[in-house]
Curated annotation (Swiss-Prot):
One Gene Ontology MF term: hormone activity
Signal peptide extent: 1-22
Disulphide bond pairs: C111-C127
Any one of the GO CC terms: cytoplasm
Name this polypeptide is given: Brain natriuretic peptide
Source organism, top-level taxon: Eukaryota
Location in the cell: Secreted
SMART domains linked: NAT_PEP
Length: 138
């Protein structure tokens, strides 16, 4: 009985796989939706080909625009010219980055992160620890 039921289940499974592969899963798009997408795709291809033709026919104009933009940029004031390179290095130094990372507002948040000295001590781990033992206060 067990062998026949297993054989029947495997036959049904194979049949199910064959039937499901013959009918593709519907994408939810109708024929009109597909037609609209095809029209949009063809319009996109046309506009891209037109733009490529314009770009290839006018390389001299692009060079002219690039030269004008570099000349305009040179005439204006430089925004970062007043900063000294040493000041920039000092601002980005590891000491300053460490002080940002060890900000006192983070250390005194009151929620986790305080140090536990030994097992059983009141270490103020957790939230709402106002008024509890703090070894720094003594």
């Amino acid at each position: 009985m067990r062998l026949s039921s297993m054989w029947l289940c495997s036959l049904l499974l194979i049949l199910k796989l064959q039937l499901s592969s013959t009918y593709p899963i519907s994408t939810g798009l109708t024929d009109t939706d597909m037609d609209i997408l095809k029209v949009l795709l063809s319009r996109l291809e046309e506009s891209v080909s037109e733009q490529m033709a314009v770009d290839q026919s006018a390389p001299g104009q692009r060079d002219l625009l690039d030269s004008l933009s570099t000349e305009d940029a040179g005439d204006g004031p430089q925004p970062d010219a007043g900063l000294d390179e040493a000041e920039i290095r000092e601002f980005l130094s590891a000491k300053n980055l460490k002080s940002v990372r060890n900000d006192s507002s983070r250390r005194s948040s009151g929620c986790f992160g305080r140090r536990m000295d030994r097992i059983g001590s009141m270490s103020s781990l957790g939230c709402n620890t106002v008024g509890r033992y703090n070894p720094k206060q003594r």
